[in-house]
Amino acid sequence: MHLTPREREKLLIVTAADLARRRQARGLKLNYPEAVAIITYEIIEGARDGRSVAELMSYGTTILQREQVMAGVAEMIPEVQVEATFPDGTKLVTVHHPIR
C-alpha cells in the first residue's frame, strides 16, 4: 500500500484516537496526546461529513470535558488547529479552549 505523508498522518491520528477511545471506555482519564488525537479525529471526520468550519469550531469544544482528562491536560491545550479536507478544499479549523 502506497500512502502519501498526509495519508500516513491521518492514519496515525485515527489509530491514536481509537486507542484513546478504548482507554476512555475502560474508565481511564486521557493524557495530552490522547485528548488531542480524539479532538483532531472528530474535526477531520466532521469535515469529511460536510460540516462547516464554524460548526466544527463550535463542536470542537464539546468533544471532551475536564472530567475525562488527567489533571492539567485541559490547561495544556489552549487551542487545537486541524488542517481538514472539506468538499470545497482544505481549510484550517482552530478550536480555542477545546476542553471545558
From Swiss-Prot:
Pathway linked to the protein: Nitrogen metabolism; urea degradation; CO(2) and NH(3) from urea (urease route): step 1/1
Gene Ontology CC annotation, any one: cytoplasm
Single GO MF descriptor: urease activity
Enzyme nomenclature, EC number: 3.5.1.5
SUPFAM superfamilies: Urease, gamma-subunit
GO terms (BP aspect): urea catabolic process
Tree of life domain: Bacteria
NCBIfam families: PRK13241.1 (NF009712), urease_gam (TIGR00193)
Subunit description: Heterotrimer of UreA (gamma), UreB (beta) and UreC (alpha) subunits. Three heterotrimers associate to form the active enzyme.
Family membership: Belongs to the urease gamma subunit family.
Protein name: Urease subunit gamma
Species, as recorded: Opitutus terrae (strain DSM 11246 / JCM 15787 / PB90-1)
